Amino acid sequence: MFNNPDFSDIATCDLEEPKNSIKIEREQVKLEKRLCREVGRAITDFNMIEEGDKIMVCMSGGKDSYTMLDVLRKLQKRAPVKFELVAVNLDQKQPGFPDHVLPEYFKSIGVDYHIETQDTYSVVKRVVPEGKTTCGLCSRLRRAILYKVADELGCTKVALGHHRDDIVQTLMLNMFYGGRMKGMPPKLVSDDGKHVVIRPLCYVPEKDTVRWAQYQNFPIIPCNLCGSQDGLQRVAVGELLREWDKKFPGRVESMFRAMGHIVTTHMMDPELHDFKNAKATGIADPNGDMAFDHEEMPVSASLPGLQVVQLSS
């Protein structure tokens, strides 16, 4: 019986040292090590993969799903447990979808795969009024179909290609437009209780999947074939975060880390903390006096010319 196998020590995957000392080759090797390390760490931290698992790797044809499949295959060769991978693509019959691209790629790398063809595009276009967003219904239909395919293939886990930036964007979207603090969990059980969904790229920043896709020259399929205008809010938030990270490097990473360090007593959710019955007990509380303290934050190195004067008390 394997309990939370450790993938974090196989960061080198099956790397070969670059034959030449060209800068781009060194960068590629460093990036591959980093991707394997971060995915391995996520798998270990959240016990994503266990002995005998059959992982359904959901493939959209975008940079993130290609990167996820590539890294999982590399980790599979040296993992402390045995598991299977099957790449699955849902062909929703969107106009112009190049249905030959993914099968040809899967055959070229020798991975088991399944193409599920379901014309959800026509259903969505028929049901959703003109000018309204189609992504919500499309997503629900796609999820139901993929769960059915997972059952048919005997898969124990469903792997999605959401990366760190997707998770932070989702948190911000829910805060800005939904009035709640909710992101994307690294691992969850589906609503019907039958499927475990994992996000192996949860520690990986988007810039790394972009760069890796460029290095590997993956045959990318565009994500706008359906013509939907949904996601404008997500695009806007994504641009905001990217611009913010340029001005204040490390802020997006800090926001991501914050999602794993929730101080429930300092939020406002009565379901998480009993504020109504909070009373003085006479027992010292290390967080108690902080209610009156101004919390000191590190000064950003990206603010040139700012001199911080330390005042003596």
Curated annotation (Swiss-Prot):
Q: Which cofactor does it need?
A: Mg(2+); [4Fe-4S] cluster
What Pfam family is a match for this entry?
ATP_bind_3
- Origin species, per record, is Delftia acidovorans (strain DSM 14801 / SPH-1)
- What's the catalysed reaction? cytidine(32) in tRNA + S-sulfanyl-L-cysteinyl-[cysteine desulfurase] + AH2 + ATP = 2-thiocytidine(32) in tRNA + L-cysteinyl-[cysteine desulfurase] + A + AMP + diphosphate + H(+)
Quote the record's cofactor note. Binds 1 [4Fe-4S] cluster per subunit. The cluster is chelated by three Cys residues, the fourth Fe has a free coordination site that may bind a sulfur atom transferred from the persulfide of IscS.
Q: What is the lineage of its organism?
A: Bacteria, Pseudomonadati, Pseudomonadota, Betaproteobacteria, Burkholderiales
**Signal peptide region:** none
Which family is it part of? Answer: Belongs to the TtcA family.
- Designated gene of the protein: ttcA
The UniProt entry annotates the motif PP-loop motif at 60-65
Query: Which protein is depicted?
Result: tRNA-cytidine(32) 2-sulfurtransferase
Additional detail: The thiolation reaction likely consists of two steps: a first activation step by ATP to form an adenylated intermediate of the target base of tRNA, and a second nucleophilic substitution step of the sulfur (S) atom supplied by the hydrosulfide attached to the Fe-S cluster.
- A GO biological process this protein is involved in? tRNA thio-modification
Name the InterPro entries on file: Rossmann-like_a/b/a_fold, TilS/TtcA_N, tRNA_Cyd_32_2_STrfase, tRNA_thiolation_TtcA_Ctu1
Q: Write one Gene Ontology MF term.
A: 4 iron, 4 sulfur cluster binding
Enumerate the PANTHER family for this protein: AMINOTRAN_5 DOMAIN-CONTAINING PROTEIN, SULFURTRANSFERASE-RELATED
Q: How would you summarize the oligomeric state and partners of this protein? A: Homodimer.
Q: Which GO terms describe its cellular component?
A: cytoplasm
Q: Which HAMAP family match?
A: TtcA
Alphabetically sorted, this entry's keywords are: 4Fe-4S, ATP-binding, Cytoplasm, Iron, Iron-sulfur, Magnesium, Metal-binding, Nucleotide-binding, RNA-binding, Transferase, tRNA processing, tRNA-binding
Kindly list the positions annotated as binding [4Fe-4S] cluster: C135, C138, C226
